[in-house]
């Protein structure tokens, strides 16, 4: 039973060999075969193929037998120690069935039989080693990963039983690189493209070749620290092209030589000297610039304190001739040179014509003495009406002679203190006979009327007297009816003038007119004989009332007013 290695497993526990059960017995003992089963000790247990274990075990046993024969101590490497791992899936030594005890006793008692079995199995392993000599037994110092993790697809005789890394991946199975990884690996060294273009890595292009390779090029120690013009750039271009045309072996050799030279203490000292010299130059240039700026600042301050330029004096008076001197400065080698002065007589004449700049501000002319300074509006209007006193001799006994003179200029016939019975037929009250028999004063004695073609007459009579310059025929009854029927706007040739309040009394902003009106109304109310129908018939206010009633009638019937604003129409009382 022990010689059937293909169907059995063995494990080393201490110095005792225990024969494990066959696959059929393992299934009956409920030993899991699944992959990726994690144990409590963070070690993954996987099913190991039968053929691989048997062959590997036979190899180990054969080596042990050789070592025993030579007198060397027995060592066995890379053997799975199932007992050392704390697992719940494998059977423990304490709860082993009786058949394991019997097998253990047989193993301890029959060592000779084991030796014979090892000799027979050694013949098989030698044939395996001859077929695959590259897979040999290697010691594994790590006992943590002594349990092997080999997938079932690699369970053939080609793969050996070796410990895997913690990532549980087989190191001998190499993954295929991606195109990006291949390109990156290729770009680490210089190579040539299929089109003939050479590629050189950046680290090789930046480094300069040693002087031995290019004798014509200057050494690194002789190169200037400051940047120069075209020749140096051309040399650098030639050097760069030379590095691009070299082979990879030459570039590697040049890099090695340069590294050795750069790491030498002499090169380090020279580099430090160059760096210190470079910073000294920068410091000296900065200090010189600062000194120049300080000198320039001091010069500008002195110029401000002591200006050398001739500034013309301001013009104070025009009595003395003024000369304006122009100086133009030109810069030559950072120095200002003054050009000789030029006199411009034209500008001088223009300035003299302008005069002094300190002029008196423009003020309005003084107030005329003829302008009234009266505070009252009524007295102001009376003042303007009484200005013309030259025609006082032609005026009648009335006070407002100037007002009557203006009426004579605008109207041909003026009725004084006459109350017409009807406003529609005012001319019926005056006849030629009345005008012939009446006494009148011709205004042409003193001064003729300028606006009237014929001389106008001014007659002062009683209530029924009038002034007329031409006879007015009496209208017929038909014409009066036609005028009343058809209303039209016209300008009369005569005017009725009554001795009433002045024009200032009719001002709406002044309440004098209303006060006088209410006084006359109250007087008429006290005398009931003055009432004629609905109108007041007093001698003083009858004309005013008739005018107001006519205006109210016109507003009520004839005046065009919007229907929405008709309620806001103002009527006289």
Curated annotation (Swiss-Prot):
Annotated Low complexity bias: 84-95, 208-225, 441-457, 466-483
Residue stretches spanning the membrane: none
Region (10 X 2 AA tandem repeats of N-M): 102-121
Each Sequence repeat, start to end: 102-103, 104-105, 106-107, 108-109, 110-111, 112-113, 114-115, 116-117, 118-119, 120-121
Keywords for the protein's UniProt record, in alphabetical order: Glycoprotein, Repeat
Protein modification: N-glycosylated.
Ranges for region Disordered: 1-33, 60-101, 150-174, 192-271, 286-317, 357-379, 441-483
GO molecular function, one term: actin binding
Biased composition regions of type Polar residues, renumbered to the chain: 60-70, 157-170, 226-252
Positions annotated with a glycan in the UniProt record: 63, 123, 236, 437, 442, 498, 535, 541
Biological process annotations from GO: actin cytoskeleton organization
Superkingdom: Eukaryota
Note: Present with 784 molecules/cell in log phase SD medium.
Family from the record: To yeast AFR1.
Protein's UniProt name: Uncharacterized protein YER158C
């Amino acid at each position: 039973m022990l010689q059937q290695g293909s169907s059995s497993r063995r494990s080393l526990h201490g110095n005792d060999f225990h024969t494990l059960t066959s696959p059929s017995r393992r299934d009956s003992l409920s030993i899991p075969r699944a992959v990726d089963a994690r144990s409590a000790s963070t070690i993954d247990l996987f099913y190991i193929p039968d053929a691989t274990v048997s062959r590997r075990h036979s190899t180990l046993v054969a080596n042990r037998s050789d070592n025993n024969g030579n007198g060397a101590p027995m060592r066995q490497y890379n053997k799975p120690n199932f007992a050392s791992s704390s697992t719940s899936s494998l059977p423990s030594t304490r709860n082993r069935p009786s058949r394991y005890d019997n097998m253990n006793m047989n193993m301890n008692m029959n060592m000779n039989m084991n030796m014979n079995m090892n000799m027979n199995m050694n013949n098989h392993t030698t044939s395996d080693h001859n077929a695959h000599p590259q897979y040999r037994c290697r010691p594994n110092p790590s006992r943590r990963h002594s349990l092997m993790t080999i997938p079932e697809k690699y369970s053939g005789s080609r793969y050996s039983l070796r410990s895997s890394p913690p990532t549980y991946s087989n190191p001998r199975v190499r993954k295929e690189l991606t195109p990006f990884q291949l390109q990156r690996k290729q770009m680490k060294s210089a190579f040539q493209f299929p089109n003939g273009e050479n590629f050189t890595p950046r680290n090789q292009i930046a480094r300069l070749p040693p002087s031995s390779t290019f004798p014509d090029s200057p050494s690194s120690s002789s190169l200037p620290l400051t940047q120069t013009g075209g020749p140096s750039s051309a040399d650098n271009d030639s050097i760069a092209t030379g590095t691009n045309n070299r082979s990879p072996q030459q570039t590697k050799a040049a890099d090695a030589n340069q590294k050795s030279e750069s790491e030498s203490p002499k090169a380090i000292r020279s580099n430090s000297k160059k760096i210190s010299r470079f910073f000294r130059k920068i410091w000296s240039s900065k200090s010189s610039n600062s000194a120049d700026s300080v000198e320039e600042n001091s010069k500008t301050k002195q110029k401000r304190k002591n200006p050398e330029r001739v500034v013309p004096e301001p013009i104070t008076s025009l009595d003395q001739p003024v000369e304006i001197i122009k100086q133009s400065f030109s810069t030559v080698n950072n120095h200002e040179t003054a050009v000789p002065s030029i006199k411009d007589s034209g500008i001088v004449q223009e300035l003299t014509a302008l005069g002094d700049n300190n002029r008196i501000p423009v003020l309005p002319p003084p107030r005329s003495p003829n302008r009234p300074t009266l505070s009252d509006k009524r007295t102001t209007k009376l003042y303007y009406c009484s200005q013309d006193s030259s025609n006082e001799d032609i005026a009648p006994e009335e006070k407002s002679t100037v007002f009557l003179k203006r009426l004579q200029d605008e109207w041909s016939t003026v009725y004084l203190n006459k109350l017409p019975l009807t406003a529609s037929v005012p001319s019926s009250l005056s006849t030629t006979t009345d005008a012939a028999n009446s006494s009148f004063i011709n205004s042409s004695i003193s001064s003729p009327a300028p606006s009237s073609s014929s001389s106008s007459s001014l007659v002062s009579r009683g209530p029924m007297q009038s002034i007329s310059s031409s006879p007015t025929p009496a209208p017929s009854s038909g014409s009066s009816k036609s005028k009343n029927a058809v209303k039209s706007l016209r300008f009369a040739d005569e005017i009725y003038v009554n001795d009433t309040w002045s024009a200032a009394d009719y001002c709406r902003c002044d309440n004098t007119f209303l006060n006088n009106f209410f006084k006359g109304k109250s007087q008429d109310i006290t005398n009931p004989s003055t009432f004629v129908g609905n109108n007041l018939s007093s001698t003083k206010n009858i004309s005013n009332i008739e005018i107001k009633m006519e205006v109210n009638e016109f507003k009520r019937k004839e005046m065009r007013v919007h229907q929405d604003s008709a309620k806001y129409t103002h009527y006289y009382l």
